[in-house]
């Protein structure tokens, strides 16, 4: 028997008290978003889609991971209450920074962070979901650049949802250790970034 994430974490208690994510924008830096029925009506739920990989103007997900993660958070349960998201009335800001293989480059990720910094007020973004791990890197300049961008978002008191994973085959989460001291939520994850 499968139990939805919402039921596992008892989000139904929050839902019963009217906490459904209404008026909250969640930005997802991932593989994109397929405009699934569970994100209806698309005109209001999918507030923005930006493609930093192929520069397409329409919402799509050529991998599936971004749509899956967005569904956990924001599904409106068109296919039954087992699929109700944690914040089913939140609006979605999907920033495609990973390709069909789940791979990406840091420059696309940084563009996504910059976009959030510039547009967070317009889209009422309060939560940033970062489903990205990366190989260990000795390039300290790349790490410093990444932390500079993330620091700029921390100052806006956004909640970060980050993957936690153990080192496997020399892979690790982006070096976001400082975020743990700030506003963040750490979740179990597997590696999708190579």
Predicted regions and their residues:
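Short, charged, surface-exposed secondary-structure boundary motifs
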Residues: 1-3, 56-61, 194
């Amino acid at each position: 028997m499968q139990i939805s994430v919402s039921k596992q974490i008892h989000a139904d208690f929050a839902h019963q008290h009217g906490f459904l994510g209404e008026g909250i924008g969640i930005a997802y830096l991932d593989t994109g978003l397929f405009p699934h029925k569970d994100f209806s009506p698309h005109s209001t739920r999918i507030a923005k889609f930006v493609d930093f990989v192929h520069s397409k103007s329409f919402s799509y997900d050529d991998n599936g991971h971004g749509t899956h993660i967005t569904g956990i958070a924001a599904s409106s349960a068109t296919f039954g209450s087992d699929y109700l998201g944690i914040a089913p009335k939140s609006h979605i800001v999907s920033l495609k920074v990973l390709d069909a293989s789940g791979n990406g480059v840091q420059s696309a990720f940084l563009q996504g962070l910059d976009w959030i910094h510039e547009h967070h007020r317009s889209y009422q973004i309060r939560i940033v979901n970062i489903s990205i791990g990366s190989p260990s890197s000795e390039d300290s300049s790349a790490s410093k650049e990444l932390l500079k961008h993330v620091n700029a978002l921390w100052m806006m008191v956004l909640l970060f949802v980050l993957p936690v994973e153990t080192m496997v085959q020399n892979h690790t989460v982006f070096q976001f250790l400082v975020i743990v001291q700030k506003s963040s939520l750490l979740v179990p994850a597997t590696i999708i970034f190579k």
